[in-house]
């Protein structure tokens, strides 16, 4: 084994989350943490028979705090990227958020079920053919610098006008002002947006697209020097995926299946 001469027992661990990123994690009146991730973590800790303590930490300093030893695990809808994998060790993914178009109800396509997309050109083309037909000559709004931006450019630029925004909330304002016809983002953003009374004229349009096409999914981070803790978490996540626990919590909090 690595640098340490003894294996750590891991009788208890401290997990940092933001506590303000609904429905992943949120803080209830009175200070208790709730949401998809805290409920999943409680289940995983039971499986591992480890005592768990959740602490609140801003996303900005989260990775630095982990590596400084302030806590042992970070859990905050963190998407696995090659860049981040250089500084933290990621567990197996417990979610892979699907994405969809949002449009004015009845303007494009009705919402349709989830399709899992891999890096397979034929599969992608088949899934998006109805969307391409519906969006021909229209304008699509997308936040710049997301995992979805290159996808929209690659598959829709030839038939639609693509407009980039600082964030998806600005794109929604333009959708309501009829300057654009659709906005593309993940289901977390979509559900939050659609739950607001002022957006009751909007709906999802076309399929929810999920799967490896969006990268590594959401996972927990641990220090690179704690492979034994990563292994414990991995087997607990695997078990929770296998017995339907993650799916059940996902449907409770996201109203859809976000399992990887």
Locate predicted features.
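Ligand-binding cleft/hinge of the Venus flytrap
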Residues: 25-28, 41-50, 110-123, 128-138, ...
């Amino acid at each position: 084994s690595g640098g340490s001469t003894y294996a750590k027992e891991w009788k208890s661990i401290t997990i940092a989350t933001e506590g303000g990123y609904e429905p992943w994690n949120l803080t209830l009146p009175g200070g208790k943490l709730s949401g998809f991730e805290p409920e999943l973590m409680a289940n995983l800790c039971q499986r591992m028979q480890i005592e768990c303590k959740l602490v609140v930490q801003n996303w900005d300093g989260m990775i630095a705090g982990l590596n400084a030893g302030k806590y042992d695990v970070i859990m905050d809808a963190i998407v696995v990227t090659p860049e981040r994998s250089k500084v933290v060790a990621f567990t197996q993914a417990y979610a892979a958020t699907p994405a969809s178009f949002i449009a004015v109800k009845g303007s494009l396509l009705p919402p349709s079920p989830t399709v899992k997309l891999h890096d397979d050109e034929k599969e992608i083309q088949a899934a998006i053919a109805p969307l391409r037909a519906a969006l021909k000559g229209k304008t699509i709004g997308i936040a710049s610098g997301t995992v979805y931006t290159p996808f929209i450019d690659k598959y829709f630029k030839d038939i639609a006008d693509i407009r980039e925004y600082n964030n998806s909330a600005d794109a929604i304002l333009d959708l309501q002002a009829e300057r654009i016809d659709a906005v593309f983002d993940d289901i977390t953003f979509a559900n939050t947006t659609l739950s607001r009374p002022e957006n009751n004229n909007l709906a999802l349009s076309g399929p929810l697209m999920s799967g490896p096409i969006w990268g590594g999914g959401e996972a927990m981070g641990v220090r690179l020097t704690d492979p034994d803790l990563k292994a414990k978490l991995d087997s607990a996540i695997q078990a929770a995926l296998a017995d339907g626990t993650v799916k059940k919590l996902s449907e409770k909090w996201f109203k859809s299946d976000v399992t990887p």
